[in-house]
Amino acid sequence: MSLLSDLINLDLSETTEKIIAEYIWIGGSGLDLRSKARTLPGPVTDPSQLPKWNYDGSSTGQAPGEDSEVIIYPQAIFKDPFRRGNNILVMCDAYTPAGEPIPTNKRHAAAKIFSHPDVVAEVPWYGIEQEYTLLQKDINWPLGWPVGGFPGPQGPYYCGAGADKAFGRDIVDSHYKACLYAGINISGINGEVMPGQWEFQVGPSVGISAGDEIWVARYILERITEVAGVVLSFDPKPIKGDWNGAGAHTNYSTKSMREDGGYEVILKAIEKLGKKHKEHIAAYGEGNERRLTGRHETADINTFLWGVANRGASIRVGRDTEKAGKGYFEDRRPSSNMDPYVVTSMIADTTILWKP
């Protein structure tokens, strides 16, 4: 293995200008991530310098076998924490050969919303809290849990330390540093309420970049768990019973909300979100009804409720925001398996563009 490690860590810059670009795209389920690599003649700093590419869509559930070619367009570049040097990760979105976005390409519609002059003027900021569960390979049971059994009840695990409370910290810290290296605006990590469950936060990120950064952070985490021999789950309720689910709480503010008098803007935005509750819930992730039960720090899926410092609400406003009279709010409804392009653009569309 030491020889393999030596070769994997070869510094290409000593012998060649060429770099490796890992093209990443979203697969047919809308949640699975795919990637493949290609050699480029030299360092690249902007997606516009990168060639488009294609893949076999019939093997990802995104095209029929008789017309299987799907074209991927490079959209965002990050440093590659695995190959390092000048090598890069490239977040792409997918199109037909005729240039139409394929159904699983949610980035295209999101980019239209984020490029609208009214949205651009408001400089929307997002901070996304991505929860996930680490599972033991082969048995799909949470890391640190006895096989076929259960650990002690929730309580000591949230932000806990110790071999009987924190399971998978090496994976979590590796991911944290890898994201910082890649240029992702990861702002923190913590152990979650259910043992084997963790969270990382990305943001504040502006507009479409929030979606790009969450997807690439997910990809990096998939790669790290692959090396560790652990399965990564974004299921919003991986274990039935008295255990917390997994969400992707989305913190949001606009320029108007961050300025003096912003609290009134926040209240108007929350009112609009309440009027479109059903539409948002429908787009906020698969299986969310198993998580949004009104228990375990959630609001009931059929009820829209907001409150200050209330973690049982659909929308939570922080005490600091209330006191300052400006700031941000947190949409607690999105599930861990949500598409960040959909959620972020929908919040902007409802709160900025929609005129009820």
From Swiss-Prot:
Belongs to the glutamine synthetase family. It comes from Medicago sativa. Homooctamer. GO terms for biological process: glutamine biosynthetic process. Pfam families: Gln-synt_C (PF00120). Its main location: cytoplasm. This is Glutamine synthetase cytosolic isozyme. PROSITE patterns: GLNA_1, GLNA_ATP, GS_BETA_GRASP, GS_CATALYTIC. It catalyses: L-glutamate + NH4(+) + ATP = L-glutamine + ADP + phosphate + H(+). One of its GO terms (cellular component) is cytoplasm.
